């Protein structure tokens, strides 16, 4: 997959801007505040309908603008073109068109344009709370497994409905509980599907992480553990068994869940643990080691997607080299040479041999790219 062109209107600090990257490695170079990250974020929006920077759609509007518009043309490795038009207004929200046709729900677009991103704030995937790791895992599996995305959306809907019933029972202790058993059974089946998809993905993904991280870290051995609310899951388990274990846990926790008005077990509370040489990275690794682990995860995703779905992802790397030493920078660049189209933002021209350089210069209303 490659991006042939993208146009920005009123997207962050790009009032009117067109960008045409080349194949291979592209360096987007400019001063801080010139809009380098915004270019990557706009591409990410077109690929996955959201930015990799944690922000609401409205925060991406240029100052005083009432809308933003992104139009992009992608080309697959087999030569098939996909035209993406994504717009947002304060009044009607976000709209997506693919090849001129409006697409709903947006989830139908996920996986069509495989995309890997890296940005410094994503260090929380390694160092932050469990929700950040679950989000990373879900985003990764959704791009490579359409069934998983469908199962995840079903699970979230069932969880919301079961929680609503638990809140009703909490507020009315004498209310009939017969419906709770039905919701528990439905949620247990859905939780089993989501959990099985996650564990299956990790079993396939881990060898890619192991190989890359050992190279980038100087020989450290990575491992990934999936700690479910029904116990540690170190290898794939039949869905039927997972369903029974979830249902049993719901029944065991029923009284406490009613008191608290929420579901206390399930994929929404599971934990993903990253370890390096057997020690939890979140607790025992330095910030530099955590960053290296994150880069290993992201580059491993590229290799996994390339093999799993048969399409080369686009790599969007925001300021990836800022805290890496020369040895690790060289190692990452060696890997990126084989990663298809890669876009790197940087305020530094050093350590980017062989890159197509796009220098961002600013005017009051426009951002221009010059090679």
Swiss-Prot record:
GO-annotated molecular function: ATP binding; ATP hydrolysis activity; single-stranded DNA binding
Protein name: DNA replication and repair protein RecF
Signal peptide annotation: none
InterPro entries assigned to the protein according to its UniProt record, in alphabetical order: DNA-binding_RecF, DNA-binding_RecF_CS, P-loop_NTPase, Rad50/SbcC_AAA, RecF_2
Gene Ontology cellular component annotations, sorted alphabetically: cytoplasm
A biological-process GO annotation: SOS response
UniProt function note: The RecF protein is involved in DNA metabolism; it is required for DNA replication and normal SOS inducibility. RecF binds preferentially to single-stranded, linear DNA. It also seems to bind ATP.
Residues given in the record as ATP binding sites: 30-37
Gene3D superfamilies: P-loop containing nucleotide triphosphate hydrolases, RecF/RecN/SMC, N-terminal domain
Family: Belongs to the RecF family.
Gene from which this protein is expressed: recF
Keywords, ordered alphabetically: ATP-binding, Cytoplasm, DNA damage, DNA repair, DNA replication, DNA-binding, Nucleotide-binding, SOS response
PANTHER family named among the record's database cross-references: DNA REPLICATION AND REPAIR PROTEIN RECF
Subcellular localization, as worded in the UniProt entry: Cytoplasm
